[in-house]
Amino acid sequence: MPALACLRRLCRHVSPQAVLFLLFIFCLFSVFISAYYLYGWKRGLEPSADAPEPDCGDPPPVAPSRLLPLKPVQAATPSRTDPLVLVFVESLYSQLGQEVVAILESSRFKYRTEIAPGKGDMPTLTDKGRGRFALIIYENILKYVNLDAWNRELLDKYCVAYGVGIIGFFKANENSLLSAQLKGFPLFLHSNLGLKDCSINPKSPLLYVTRPSEVEKGVLPGEDWTVFQSNHSTYEPVLLAKTRSSESIPHLGADAGLHAALHATVVQDLGLHDGIQRVLFGNNLNFWLHKLVFVDAVAFLTGKRLSLPLDRYILVDIDDIFVGKEGTRMKVEDVKALFDTQNELRAHIPNFTFNLGYSGKFFHTGTNAEDAGDDLLLSYVKEFWWFPHMWSHMQPHLFHNQSVLAEQMALNKKFAVEHGIPTDMGYAVAPHHSGVYPVHVQLYEAWKQVWSIRVTSTEEYPHLKPARYRRGFIHNGIMVLPRQTCGLFTHTIFYNEYPGGSSELDKIINGGELFLTVLLNPISIFMTHLSNYGNDRLGLYTFKHLVRFLHSWTNLRLQTLPPVQLAQKYFQIFSEEKDPLWQDPCEDKRHKDIWSKEKTCDRFPKLLIIGPQKTGTTALYLFLGMHPDLSSNYPSSETFEEIQFFNGHNYHKGIDWYMEFFPIPSNTTSDFYFEKSANYFDSEVAPRRAAALLPKAKVLTILINPADRAYSWYQHQRAHDDPVALKYTFHEVITAGSDASSKLRALQNRCLVPGWYATHIERWLSAYHANQILVLDGKLLRTEPAKVMDMVQKFLGVTNTIDYHKTLAFDPKKGFWCQLLEGGKTKCLGKSKGRKYPEMDLDSRAFLKDYYRDHNIELSKLLYKMGQTLPTWLREDLQNTR
């Protein structure tokens, strides 16, 4: 109690005036604190008239500081997040947002774009305790800074808990404050600056691909740059630059020497302030070094989950050797330069070798000086790699006879043997990439017959542009690799006459499109031409400068491999690309130009009946075939009326094989082909494949009660003597546990899984628009087929409609409707259709009713969303569920 007594004595000696004075001081302090936080919370950028001057000399600014408490940074936990990037954009068409997406797509990183919410809902960030995103990118960092309190806290807590970083861009405009503090951060921004001479901070921890040994001399693009300044140890500069002149930045001070200081244009937040790591850019991605650092930022903030290895494989093809007009070909000095440059490039790319593609027919068809160049080139035959073009440089798709095509190849091979050119490289390129994609079957067969070709390349798969979408595939035992352009074409032979000026070529090389191609692709096959190596030798100029630039600015390890080994490496990296995706050749003009004129897209079906099995698809197939304007496919010797192209191994036989199942169209416009394959419905690959080849097709599916469908499939298997179906009862099949045999589980899946109607229709809706899909009531098709066929005709939009009431008749013996022929006779389906089965046992029906309850509810929601009528069986089932 002595302390209490002392306090009482002290209070007796303190005057009331002193107490009031202390209370006044306390209130002032409280008001000051409250105003600071309230005022700071409501602004994205705070004016900073007396911001501390940046000390931006060498070493770079951002001196360590411990003024603010440090928070531990949560380490990235790859197993807890999906490798998906969430990109917040200003709009779906904003330039910076598209550039960010383009880099992610080029790197084959998965992403999701969202319009940046101001006060809207934040996308769901977690799913069952797992983070949905490994990285957050804001096109406009102020959209993040100014998030409403709820969403900001939600996002920040997610980033801390799951170790997720943020990349943000600040793009100044005419309304931007010249000097401001970023709300809630110990970071100052100085905007609308012109900068020059950019350098890289060698101490930056995020550097991976970027090599910090160079300075990019000269003016940086634009005058709207923002630089960052802070005294907090959480901020580390990544890129630094000088201002163009001290006069242009009065808000940074009037020191005459200030313009020579370095200012951070990209800054890394190490997470010491609030536990979240960030990388902030003071401009967009127009500056090439920003693209390079952006790639490193993505890698660093995701713990290299979203990054490519440093190895880059490069192959330079020189097409049209011996081909070319006089004046465009290589002479003796050009050939020597080619050989010397190859040796020079080997200093940076071990065993680098130019790959020469020849057409022997044109040997010695230039001037005397050019013919001497041909001779010298052949004397160096062992110094280069070689691959065949066509003998006469003809486009293979123009040859419809495989034997004639093979004869042309044999002439080129004879020329090669006579001149000591190796013929076992296993690689070939078709002139203009003709016949590679779209596939010309005769080319692939002739290549294998004459040359034993294993690898080719094309720039046309799946399309020429955008180049970042080019992919590889394997067809008929031949690996097809994506081929890249490098800014050089047959007509670009003089440096000073380069389109747009020589500076355009240098821009492509030094940080431009060619540089980015190597940066973002593990394997690059470049297409050049003979004419690029004569005259000004732009081919040599381009690749010497490219390799030099890559060596100066990156840590990439440049390598090369012969074509076959390169293809094997490619499909080791991108194994998911082995399966091709056949597209409609008539949807791309370039594809149509290199597709045989004997083929027509009118031969493709306009309607697919996709199933599922045991719902009445064969009956619908028969009814459609009765229409005079509708023609079905020819039957298959293996799968009868079904082609089964899009869901299985037949797909790899190609579109020529597929088209053979349909008649050559007549001159009438009413031709309407269709095909029915009931196992397309629940196939995971069929929707995407079908939509690629038949993007405008209509799709029909028939649904019956999934319990009845499952039982019908079981009985179908028993009728075909399936030993598993004969051994087990239906109830045993559908209730089998996870410990059941693989064969029993397989039968169970074929009974149950196709009945997940909503799941499968959703997959088709991801490939086709809802107005291209019609869901038919299988029960109604069985009882009132004419009514259903009226709906189908309207859906298809056929010119001539027929009255199915007059063409269908019920056959009491069969128990279903059949085609009515002259004289009152009927044509019905075969004996395998309309079988009589025992009634399903009550326990099985009860089990399936419960099993499919949620699936049927989802189906009803989906059909409502599609604007389609609920089948009668579904309405009854839902009513009983209630």
Curated annotation (Swiss-Prot):
Tissue specificity: Widely expressed. Expression is most abundant in heart, liver and pancreas.
Disorder this protein is connected to according to its UniProt record: Intellectual developmental disorder, autosomal recessive 46: A disorder characterized by significantly below average general intellectual functioning associated with impairments in adaptive behavior and manifested during the developmental period. MRT46 manifestations include delayed psychomotor development apparent from infancy or early childhood, delayed or absent expressive speech, hypotonia, and therapy-responsive seizures in some patients. Behavioral abnormalities are variable and include aggression, self-injurious behavior, and sleep disturbances.
UniProt cross-references to Gene3D superfamilies, sorted A to Z: P-loop containing nucleotide triphosphate hydrolases
GO biological process, one term: inflammatory response
Pfam families registered for this protein in UniProt: HSNSD-CE (PF12062), HSNSD_N (PF25119), Sulfotransfer_1 (PF00685)
Keywords from the UniProt entry: Disease variant, Disulfide bond, Glycoprotein, Golgi apparatus, Hydrolase, Inflammatory response, Intellectual disability, Membrane, Multifunctional enzyme, Signal-anchor, Transferase, Transmembrane, Transmembrane helix
Protein name: Bifunctional heparan sulfate N-deacetylase/N-sulfotransferase 1
GO molecular function: deacetylase activity; heparan sulfate N-deacetylase activity; heparan sulfate N-sulfotransferase activity; N-acetylglucosamine deacetylase activity
Segments for region (Heparan sulfate N-sulfotransferase 1): 599-882
Catalytic residue list: 614 (for sulfotransferase activity)
Lumenal side, ranges: 40-882
Impact upon substituting residue 614 to A: Loss of heparan sulfate-glucosamine N-sulfotransferase activity
Disulfide partners: 818-828
Protein family (similarity comment): Belongs to the sulfotransferase 1 family. NDST subfamily.
Cytoplasmic topological domain: 1-17
Glycosylation sites: 231, 351, 401, 667
InterPro entries given in the database record: Heparan_SO4_deacetylase_dom, HSNSD_N, NST/OST, P-loop_NTPase, Sulfotransferase_dom
GO CC annotation: Golgi apparatus; Golgi membrane; trans-Golgi network membrane
Species assigned in the record: Homo sapiens (Human)
Region Sufficient for localization to Golgi membrane, residue ranges: 1-169
Domain of life, source organism: Eukaryota
Transmembrane parts of this sequence: 18-39
Subunit and partners: Monomer.
Record region (Heparan sulfate N-deacetylase 1): 40-598
